[in-house]
Amino acid sequence: MRVLGVDPGLTRCGIGVVDGGRGRTVTCVGVGVARTPADQELSARLLGVAEAVDEWLDTHRPEVVAIERVFSQHNVRTVMGTAQVSGIVALAAARRGLPVAFHTPSEVKAAISGSGRADKRQVTTMVTKILGLAEAPKPADAADALALAVCHLWRAPMAGRLAEAEAKAAALARNHKARLKDARQAAAQRAARTGGVQR
């Protein structure tokens, strides 16, 4: 499976593509950062990120897009920009019929380093090691994008099995409810035919 990971941001949007093999084998296909100047109009910045994401999607043709889930921070302006970029990336994926997965920073850190509290340096070190890179991806946004892609590759099979189990459980519950309803209706019809006398 090929995953495009995105660490959304207006000034620096990290983008990384990773291929998953057997087991936990992963290979870096490409990594980069889409940059926009802070003094540019918001619409122009969003367009710049959108064009970069489109190019990555069309060049690398991933099967799924993994985006970091936006959490509220102290700087509302930063959160807004990050959320807007996330929306643009999700839209670009949807236009190509690609599924989009959102992962929290702690999910990514836990998948990559074993600890949801790992710092950026630890995540970068582990991403470099896991992917067998000659040097660490820079800046941290690039490493984070690769970490998102790896996280999705490693979590997706379990998430898929969980979703399948939940769907089966829901189907069993629906069938059980339908059988109960049918049994109650049949009992009511028998009671009506016999004048309410149960035999």
Curated annotation (Swiss-Prot):
It is found in: Cytoplasm. It comes from the Bacteria. Its EC number is 3.1.21.10. The keyword Mitochondrion does not apply. Belongs to the RuvC family. The RuvA-RuvB-RuvC complex processes Holliday junction (HJ) DNA during genetic recombination and DNA repair. Endonuclease that resolves HJ intermediates. Cleaves cruciform DNA by making single-stranded nicks across the HJ at symmetrical positions within the homologous arms, yielding a 5'-phosphate and a 3'-hydroxyl group; requires a central core of homology in the junction. The consensus cleavage sequence is 5'-(A/T)TT(C/G)-3'. Cleavage occurs on the 3'-side of the TT dinucleotide at the point of strand exchange. CDD domains: RuvC (cd16962). Its main location: cytoplasm. It holds the Pfam family RuvC. Mg(2+) 1 binds at residues 7, 141. GO terms for biological process: DNA recombination; DNA repair. Transmembrane segments: none annotated. One of its GO terms (molecular function) is crossover junction DNA endonuclease activity. Homodimer which binds Holliday junction (HJ) DNA. The HJ becomes 2-fold symmetrical on binding to RuvC with unstacked arms; it has a different conformation from HJ DNA in complex with RuvA. In the full resolvosome a probable DNA-RuvA(4)-RuvB(12)-RuvC(2) complex forms which resolves the HJ. The lineage of its organism: Bacteria, Bacillati, Actinomycetota, Actinomycetes, Pseudonocardiales. It comes from Saccharopolyspora erythraea (strain ATCC 11635 / DSM 40517 / JCM 4748 / NBRC 13426 / NCIMB 8594 / NRRL 2338). InterPro entries: RNaseH-like_sf, RNaseH_sf, X-over_junc_endoDNase_Mg_BS, X-over_junc_endoDNase_RuvC. GO terms for cellular component: cytoplasm; Holliday junction resolvase complex. Disulfide bonds: none annotated. It is an enzyme of class 3 (hydrolase). Keywords: Cytoplasm, DNA damage, DNA recombination, DNA repair, DNA-binding, Endonuclease, Hydrolase, Magnesium, Metal-binding, Nuclease. It catalyses: Endonucleolytic cleavage at a junction such as a reciprocal single-stranded crossover between two homologous DNA duplexes (Holliday junction). This is Crossover junction endodeoxyribonuclease RuvC. Binds 2 Mg(2+) ion per subunit. HAMAP family: RuvC (MF_00034). The active site is at residues 7, 68, 141. Mg(2+) 2 binds at residue 68. Its cofactor is Mg(2+).
